[in-house]
Regions:
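A solvent-exposed, charged loop/short amphipathic helix patch at secondary-structure junctions
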Residues: 108-115, 119-123, 271-299
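Aromatic-rich peripheral "rim/lid" segments of glycoside hydrolase catalytic domains that contact
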Residues: 19, 104-119, 308, 316, ...
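Active-site mouth of glycoside hydrolases
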Residues: 1-217, 223, 231, 251, ...
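Glycoside hydrolase catalytic-domain groove-lining segments
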Residues: 172-182, 189-292, 310-317, 322, ...
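Short acidic (Asp/Glu) and glycine-rich catalytic loops that position anionic groups and cofactors
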Residues: 133, 289-292, 343-347
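Glycan-recognition surfaces
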Residues: 215-239, 280-295, 354-389, 410-411
């Protein structure tokens, strides 16, 4: 059987989502060596759409050169790479080229940043609008030409939680988008293709169907966090992630790489006041009577995080996952705290396996321990839901399905 993949999602701790504007190959090479030193095998990283495509018919040559250098740094460290295109949605913000925006579309619950400034507009219909589809094909072809079949290239990811940019009008639009961009990448690269679906795609009907959107993919992916999941039993709930994985596996009939999992870490000497982080557009949680050392957001202590990481990845492996990629490599430099997305989401500074001074957290040792076990992918278990019935039951049905799932895990 194939090796069970372990890796991280990557932004540098000194620049975070501003990596391509402040590209520091030395820092990247240092980080890749440390990731490899932990025994991890794969790095997922993100191409800023605004940086790479300054106009609708132009792909920036300097950015393409930096992309090649990034692939080289990953490969030189003995790691595999999973580039994510059209980014797009990231950490509660939609980072978009100005030319992709539609003045008739308000930005919705996620704010838009275009050209470094906030915009009141959201993206046009990138699933079905010919103008935006052609621009995405150009991006895919040009990036694919640069990478081709680079020895470090594990797979392409079509987008990070792309439904947060805009929901498709119908599942057929999302399926056609997926097929068209997969074909564009395969013109120059034989690497597998997937795309970053996430928990909210399974919590309500967002006009995506795994069976159709995942049809051209080599495997499906899923993202999930107990602090963001409305059906979670709490911030330490280690069954949320494997449940989402098995629902995706059941509906798509594809094996699943869990390409984002994690939780925010509590600042030193604080405890979590809540079990959930409200999503953009949701009301704040009631303050109530909080302990004097309460953090400002739902979080896990460093010790809790290490235990959670091992437990949740163990479940992903046991229930047929292809692997798990932790979100994320590093806590970010405090100097970034006043910039988007952190100015409105301080918890986003604290998801890393290394602190913002570069020192390792206990969760890094937990991942290293898991990697040292050199596990292989296990056979997929039977389906736990049928796609048609599952989507017909949303949004309320997920609570029932999850409780039943947890009971089965307890009783065997």
């Amino acid at each position: 059987m194939a090796d069970f993949l372990l890796g991280v999602n990557y932004w540098p701790r000194r620049s975070a989502m501003y990596m391509w504007e402040r590209f520091d190959l030395g820092e990247i090479r240092e980080d890749m060596a440390r990731i490899k030193g932990l025994g991890l095998g794969i790095v997922r990283f993100f191409l800023s759409w605004d940086t790479f495509a300054p106009s609708i018919d132009t792909i920036d040559t300097r950015a393409l050169g930096d992309f090649e250098a990034m692939l080289g740094a990953i490969g030189d460290a003995g790691l595999q790479a999973m580039p994510t295109l059209f980014c797009g949605h990231m950490s509660g913000v939609n980072w978009l080229p100005a030319w992709s925006l539609d003045p008739a579309t308000p930005h919705g619950r996620f704010r838009t940043i275009a050209g470094g400034a906030a915009s009141p507009y959201g993206i046009g219909d990138f699933y079905a609008g010919e103008r935006l589809l052609a621009a995405q094909e150009l991006f895919a072809r040009r990036v694919g030409e640069r990478a081709r079949d680079h020895p470090a290239l594990y797979a392409w990811d079509l987008g990070n939680e792309f439904s947060n940019l805009r929901e498709p009008r119908a599942p057929a639009d999302a399926a056609a988008w997926s097929s068209r961009l997969t074909s564009a990448l395969h013109e120059t690269s034989e690497a597998p293709v997937t795309a970053g679906t996430h928990g909210e795609d399974l919590e309500r009907d967002r006009h995506l169907r795994p069976s159709s959107i995942a049809r051209p993919w080599a495997f499906a992916t899923m993202h999930g966090y107990p602090v963001y999941s409305a059906f979670s039993r709490g911030r330490l709930d280690a069954d949320v992630v494997p449940f989402l994985m098995q629902v995706m596996q059941s509906c798509s009939d594809k094996r699943v790489l869990f390409s984002e999992l994690g939780n925010p870490t509590c600042p030193p000497d604080t405890v979590s006041p809540y079990d959930r982080v409200p999503l953009p557009g949701e009301p704040p949680l009631p303050a109530g009577a909080l302990p004097p050392n309460a953090a400002a957001y739902a979080c896990l202590t460093e010790a809790e995080m290490a235990d959670y990481a091992y437990a949740v990845i163990d479940r992903v492996h046991a229930r047929g996952g292809l692997g798990a990629l932790w979100w994320c490599w590093a806590d970010y430099d405090a100097a970034l705290a006043t910039l988007p997305p952190f100015d409105r989401a301080q918890h986003e500074l604290h998801f890393g396996i290394v602190r913002n001074d570069g020192s390792l957290k206990p969760v890094a040792q937990a991942l290293q321990r898991m990697a040292s076990e050199q596990r292989s992918v296990l056979p997929a278990p039977p389906a736990i839901v049928s796609e048609a019935a599952y989507y017909a039951s949303l949004p309320s049905g997920i609570e029932h399905d999850y409780r039943r799932y947890c009971q089965r895990q307890t009783t065997g």
